[in-house]
């Protein structure tokens, strides 16, 4: 379920704000979205894995807080990011 180093590098390069950026809110949201998607697939196959479900809820809460921060900073950046990630319908 953990992200491979190669996949992390792909996500970072796609969402980084500048060349050495590895921890901006955009990158963090993209990483969390990837982890959430993988964990959701796992939970569809393993319905009784309650500890993973709790972890999923924690990840969703963390992503929600980061998205709120991005929304406060720049509404346009927020709209572009959620459209790019395909979240929030």
UniProtKB/Swiss-Prot annotation:
One GO MF term: rRNA binding
Origin, by domain of life? Bacteria
UniProt GO BP? translation
PROSITE patterns linked to this entry: RIBOSOMAL_S15
Which keywords describe this protein according to UniProt?
Answer: Ribonucleoprotein, Ribosomal protein, RNA-binding, rRNA-binding
* Stored HAMAP family: Ribosomal_uS15_B (MF_01343_B)
The family annotation for this protein states: Belongs to the universal ribosomal protein uS15 family.
Protein name (database record): Small ribosomal subunit protein uS15
Organism of provenance: Nostoc punctiforme (strain ATCC 29133 / PCC 73102)
Give the source lineage, highest ranks first.
Bacteria, Bacillati, Cyanobacteriota, Cyanophyceae, Nostocales
